[in-house]
């Protein structure tokens, strides 16, 4: 066992004025990326900031979607509040639509105007209902796979010294109030300074959002170690078996297959089902014989186009209304086209 490792200090960042930076890349569309330093993992303000990010840029009911994507000024716009081991950042990004004629500077102004709109609009009750349902659902759905269980247990043990921290995590988000969201908005985002990065296609530096006013310094990982291999005390493990011998093979492990049931109806519909009690969730998969193999030879891509259109407005609901209803349930519907089937999941 090595020496005990102390928890590192959580750094506190302060940016005294907006830092504009840019880079060229082998990309087709330009990108505007705005980020603000916030708090650390599981800080009391982390959950309200997560809720704020969802209100501003989470799905088709968000403000940025309304002001950028629905207006066809951008092909993508989103907001996130990711956390690493020691710190979190509040990030807003958008990719201008090439046919809109909007520059990165225009997109930045729309984003800043959206923040002003949010302050005037405030937090609505539906905002909290949607975000809290989505957050709880993401925790629960994350437990449906072995990797999801292991990841959550390991992360909770590492950062909270409690592998079963999921209940406290869900409670953190359920306890967020409208006042909490407005408080963190005014503390970390409103009138605060951040880093604004323009990523543009090669040779288009003239299209950046604003002139660069900051040059990042060289990154250093510290001085090189002068320790030689001869100075290291090697601890050799002791085996209780002979590694030169191939172990004998045992009996094949039986696979625990869930019990399935099937029902065939007179109209030709067949249902295959099973029950799992690991999580309180229900999953439905509808398979329709309308995949790529059913396309006419001169109309390749029709199935994929149909699948995409199913996610848009219907005669009874707009795309925003569908998204809002699903978010309040903590549910999702995905439609995709495979070779044989159109899949509704």
Tell me the role of every PLM-derived stretch.
Residues 29-40, 66-175, 195-200, 207-211, ...:
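M16 family metallopeptidases and their MPP-like homologs
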């Amino acid at each position: 066992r090595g020496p005990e490792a102390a928890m590192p200090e959580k750094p506190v960042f302060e940016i005294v004025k907006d830092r504009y930076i840019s880079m060229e890349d082998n990309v087709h569309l330009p990108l505007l990326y705005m980020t603000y330093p916030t708090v650390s993992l599981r800080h009391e303000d982390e959950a309200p900031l997560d809720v704020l990010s969802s209100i501003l840029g989470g799905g088709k009911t968000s403000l940025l979607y309304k002001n950028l994507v629905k207006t066809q000024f951008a092909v993508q716009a989103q907001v996130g509040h990711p956390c690493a081991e020691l710190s979190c950042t509040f990030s807003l990004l958008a990719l201008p639509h090439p046919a809109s004629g909007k520059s990165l500077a225009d997109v930045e102004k729309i984003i800043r105007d959206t923040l002003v709109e949010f302050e005037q609009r405030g937090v609505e009750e539906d905002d909290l209902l949607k975000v809290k349902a989505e957050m709880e659902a993401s925790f629960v759905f994350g437990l449906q796979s072995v990797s999801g269980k292991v990841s959550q247990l390991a992360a909770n043990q590492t950062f909270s010294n409690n592998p079963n921290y999921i209940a406290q995590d869900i409670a953190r988000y359920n306890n967020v109030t409208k006042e909490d969201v407005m408080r963190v908005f005014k503390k970390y985002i409103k009138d605060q300074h951040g880093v604004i990065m323009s990523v543009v296609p090669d040779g288009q530096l003239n299209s950046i959002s604003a002139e660069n006013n900051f040059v990042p310094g060289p990154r250093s990982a510290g001085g090189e170690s002068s320790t030689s291999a001869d100075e290291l005390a090697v601890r050799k493990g002791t085996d209780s078996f002979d590694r030169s011998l191939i172990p004998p093979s045992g009996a094949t492990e039986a696979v625990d297959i869930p019990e399935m049931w099937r029902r065939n109806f007179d109209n030709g519909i067949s249902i295959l089902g099973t029950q799992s009690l690991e999580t309180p969730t229900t999953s439905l998969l509808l398979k329709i014989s309308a995949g790529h193999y059913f396309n006419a030879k001169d109309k390749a891509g029709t199935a994929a186009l149909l699948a995409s259109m199913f996610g848009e407005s219907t005669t009874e609901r707009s795309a925003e209304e569908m998204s809002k209803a699903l978010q309040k349930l903590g549910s999702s519907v995905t439609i995709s086209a495979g070779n044989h089937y159109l899949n509704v999941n």
